[in-house]
C-alpha cells in the first residue's frame, strides 16, 4: 500500500472516530428520518391512547388508598386545632365575610380591653412546608405565629394584614373580582411592593381557611388552552378547537367555568409557549385527540387549578412535555405535588400522576440530538439538579432519579426546540407520535 493511501486511511479512521463521538448534523438528521419509518399507522397509536384513557378513567383518584384516605380525613378537619396540617377549601362570599367580621370583632374587643391586638397567623416558614408521601404533595404544618400591633418591627405587618382583610371584605361585599395588582395599587405606600401584599394575601387565606380564589383576588391571565375541549366561561360557550394558534386564555376566575366537555384521550401539558404554538398550528389535537395547555413557564394558580379540574372531571391521563433541564423538572413537580409558597392549598392545586413524556435527558442520545443543539449545564444548573435529587418527591420516583443522574453525569441540557434541528415539525410529526406509540413516559 502506498504512503499516500496509508495516510488517507489513517485520516479517514480519525474522522470516523470523531464522528462517533460527535455525530455530524447530516448523520443525526439521517437517523432522525429513519425514526419516521418506525411509526405505525395512527389507528394503532390511537388504540394505545384509548387503552391508556380507559385505564385512567377506571383507576382510583390519587391518594385514595386506605392510608391516604385516613390522612385526607384528618387533614379535612380544618377547624380541628389538633389537625397536623393546614387544608383550605373553597368558601362562598358570605362565609368568608363572616370569618373576617369575627376576626375584626375579636381585635376590637382586645383593643377596648387595653390589651392591644394581635393576629394569629399560620407560619409559612420553609421548615413548616413538608412533603407527605401518603398524599403525594407538599403540605403546610399547622404552626401559628403572633403578628401584634406592638412595636415598629411588627406594627407595619399587622397594619398590612388589617388593610388586606378590609380590602377583601369590600371586594366580597360588592360581588366582584380584582387582580393582585389591583389590590397592591389601592395602597402603594403602605405595601411598598407587590411581594408584600401578595404574601399577606396568602397569609389571609390561611387565617380564614379558604382558597385564594374564595377571596375574589386573582392573578392576571397567563395560561392558555387549545384542543378538544368545550366549556362555559361565565355563561359564554367556548370551543377550544376554534381558538387559533394562540389558544384560549385560561380564565383567572375558575369558579365561573362550567359545563366542561371533551372527547380527548389525554391532556398534554407543555412548559413553553413556543412548543404550544407549534402543536396548535399543526393541529396536533386533531390527529391525536387531546387537550393542550401551557402556563408559558412557571405555573400560575389559574393554570394549576384548571389542569386539576380537567383531570378530576374528565378523568384523563396527563402527559408532560418540558425542557430537559432542572427547571423543566421543577415546573413539572409544582404541577404534581405543589409549591412551597402555596403549600397550604396543595390539595386544590396539585395534579398527581402526571407522566413525564419528554424531553428527558436520556432522549438526547436516544434521538441523537446534535451536540451543537445541546447546552452545557452551568454551575447553578448543577446545584439545582443536585438539590432536586435530595427532594423526597423525587426520591419516590426511580425514573426521575435516573434521568436526573443522567443529566448531572453528562452535564448537558436541551430545550424542546432542540428537536427543531431535524425540521420545524419534527416535534409533532415524529417525536411525539413515536413517544406515544412506544408509551415512553415515566
From Swiss-Prot:
<keyword id="KW-0547">Nucleotide-binding</keyword>
<protein>
    <recommendedName>
        <fullName>DNA topoisomerase 6 subunit A3</fullName>
        <ecNumber>5.6.2.2</ecNumber>
    </recommendedName>
</protein>
<dbReference type="GO" id="GO:0009330">
    <property type="term" value="C:DNA topoisomerase type II (double strand cut, ATP-hydrolyzing) complex"/>
</dbReference>
<keyword id="KW-0539">Nucleus</keyword>
<comment type="subunit">
    <text>Homodimer. Heterotetramer of two TOP6A and two TOP6B subunits. Interacts with TOP6B.</text>
</comment>
<dbReference type="GO" id="GO:0042138">
    <property type="term" value="P:meiotic DNA double-strand break formation"/>
</dbReference>
<dbReference type="Pfam" id="PF21180">
    <property type="entry name" value="TOP6A-Spo11_Toprim"/>
</dbReference>
<dbReference type="Pfam" id="PF04406">
    <property type="entry name" value="TP6A_N"/>
</dbReference>
<dbReference type="InterPro" id="IPR036388">
    <property type="entry name" value="WH-like_DNA-bd_sf"/>
</dbReference>
<feature type="region of interest" description="Disordered">
    <location>
        <begin position="1"/>
        <end position="34"/>
    </location>
</feature>
<keyword id="KW-0238">DNA-binding</keyword>
<keyword id="KW-0479">Metal-binding</keyword>
<comment type="similarity">
    <text>Belongs to the TOP6A family.</text>
</comment>
<feature type="binding site">
    <location>
        <position position="323"/>
    </location>
    <ligand>
        <name>Mg(2+)</name>
    </ligand>
</feature>
<dbReference type="InterPro" id="IPR036078">
    <property type="entry name" value="Spo11/TopoVI_A_sf"/>
</dbReference>
<keyword id="KW-0413">Isomerase</keyword>
<dbReference type="InterPro" id="IPR004085">
    <property type="entry name" value="TopoVI_A"/>
</dbReference>
<dbReference type="GO" id="GO:0006265">
    <property type="term" value="P:DNA topological change"/>
</dbReference>
<feature type="binding site">
    <location>
        <position position="271"/>
    </location>
    <ligand>
        <name>Mg(2+)</name>
    </ligand>
</feature>
<dbReference type="GO" id="GO:0000228">
    <property type="term" value="C:nuclear chromosome"/>
</dbReference>
<dbReference type="GO" id="GO:0007131">
    <property type="term" value="P:reciprocal meiotic recombination"/>
</dbReference>
<comment type="function">
    <text>Component of the DNA topoisomerase VI involved in chromatin organization and progression of endoreduplication cycles. Relaxes both positive and negative superturns and exhibits a strong decatenase activity. May be involved in cell proliferation and stress tolerance.</text>
</comment>
<feature type="domain" description="Topo IIA-type catalytic">
    <location>
        <begin position="91"/>
        <end position="224"/>
    </location>
</feature>
<dbReference type="GO" id="GO:0005524">
    <property type="term" value="F:ATP binding"/>
</dbReference>
<dbReference type="GO" id="GO:0000706">
    <property type="term" value="P:meiotic DNA double-strand break processing"/>
</dbReference>
<dbReference type="GO" id="GO:0003918">
    <property type="term" value="F:DNA topoisomerase type II (double strand cut, ATP-hydrolyzing) activity"/>
</dbReference>
<keyword id="KW-0799">Topoisomerase</keyword>
<dbReference type="InterPro" id="IPR034136">
    <property type="entry name" value="TOPRIM_Topo6A/Spo11"/>
</dbReference>
<dbReference type="InterPro" id="IPR013049">
    <property type="entry name" value="Spo11/TopoVI_A_N"/>
</dbReference>
<dbReference type="GO" id="GO:0000287">
    <property type="term" value="F:magnesium ion binding"/>
</dbReference>
<keyword id="KW-0460">Magnesium</keyword>
<dbReference type="GO" id="GO:0003677">
    <property type="term" value="F:DNA binding"/>
</dbReference>
<dbReference type="InterPro" id="IPR002815">
    <property type="entry name" value="Spo11/TopoVI_A"/>
</dbReference>
<feature type="active site" description="O-(5'-phospho-DNA)-tyrosine intermediate">
    <location>
        <position position="185"/>
    </location>
</feature>
Amino acid at each position: 500500500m502506498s504512503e499516500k493511501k496509508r495516510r488517507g486511511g489513517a485520516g479517514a479512521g480519525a474522522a470516523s472516530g470523531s464522528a462517533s463521538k460527535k455525530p455530524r448534523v447530516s448523520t443525526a438528521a439521517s437517523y432522525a428520518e429513519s425514526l419516521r419509518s418506525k411509526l405505525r399507522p395512527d389507528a394503532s397509536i390511537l388504540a394505545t391512547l384509548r387503552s391508556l384513557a380507559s385505564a385512567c378513567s377506571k383507576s382510583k383518584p390519587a391518594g385514595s388508598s386506605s392510608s391516604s384516605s385516613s390522612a385526607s380525613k384528618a387533614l379535612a378537619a380544618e377547624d380541628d386545632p389538633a389537625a397536623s396540617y393546614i387544608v383550605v377549601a373553597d368558601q362562598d362570599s358570605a362565609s368568608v365575610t363572616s370569618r373576617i367580621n369575627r376576626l375584626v370583632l375579636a381585635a376590637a374587643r382586645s383593643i377596648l380591653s387595653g390589651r392591644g391586638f394581635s393576629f394569629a397567623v399560620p407560619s409559612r416558614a420553609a421548615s413548616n412546608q413538608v412533603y407527605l408521601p401518603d398524599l403525594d404533595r407538599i403540605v403546610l404544618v399547622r404552626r401559628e405565629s403572633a403578628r401584634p400591633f406592638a412595636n415598629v418591627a411588627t406594627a407595619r405587618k399587622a397594619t398590612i394584614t388589617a388593610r388586606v382583610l378590609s380590602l377583601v371584605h369590600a371586594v366580597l361585599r360588592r360581588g366582584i373580582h380584582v387582580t393582585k395588582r389591583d389590590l397592591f395599587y389601592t395602597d402603594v405606600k403602605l405595601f411598598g411592593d407587590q411581594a408584600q401584599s401578595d404574601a399577606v394575601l396568602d397569609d389571609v387565606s390561611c387565617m380564614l381557611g379558604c382558597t385564594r380564589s374564595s377571596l375574589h383576588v386573582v392573578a392576571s391571565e397567563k395560561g392558555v388552552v387549545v384542543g378538544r375541549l368545550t366549556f362555559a366561561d361565565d355563561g359564554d360557550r367556548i370551543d377550544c378547537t376554534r381558538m387559533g394558534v394562540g389558544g384560549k386564555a385560561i380564565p383567572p376566575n375558575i369558579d365561573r367555568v362550567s359545563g366542561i366537555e371533551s372527547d380527548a384521550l389525554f391532556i398534554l401539558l407543555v412548559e413553553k409557549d413556543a412548543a404550544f404554538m407549534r402543536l396548535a398550528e399543526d393541529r396536533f389535537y386533531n390527529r391525536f385527540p387531546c387537550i393542550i395547555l401551557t402556563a408559558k413557564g412557571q405555573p400560575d394558580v389559574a393554570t394549576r387549578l384548571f389542569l386539576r379540574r380537567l383531570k378530576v372531571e374528565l378523568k384523563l391521563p396527563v402527559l408532560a412535555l418540558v425542557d430537559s433541564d432542572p427547571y423543566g423538572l421543577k415546573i413539572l413537580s409544582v404541577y404534581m405535588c405543589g409549591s412551597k409558597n402555596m403549600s397550604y392549598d396543595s390539595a386544590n392545586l396539585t395534579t398527581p400522576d402526571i407522566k413525564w413524556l419528554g424531553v428527558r435527558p436520556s432522549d438526547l442520545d436516544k434521538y441523537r440530538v446534535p451536540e451543537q443543539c445541546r447546552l452545557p449545564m452551568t454551575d447553578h444548573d448543577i446545584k439545582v439538579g443536585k438539590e432536586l435529587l435530595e427532594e423526597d418527591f423525587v426520591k419516590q420516583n426511580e425514573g426521575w432519579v435516573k434521568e436526573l443522574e443522567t443529566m448531572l453525569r453528562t452535564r448537558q441540557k436541551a430545550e424542546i426546540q432542540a428537536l427543531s434541528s431535524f425540521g420545524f415539525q419534527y416535534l409533532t410529526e415524529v417525536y411525539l407520535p413515536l413517544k406515544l406509540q412506544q408509551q415512553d413516559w415515566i
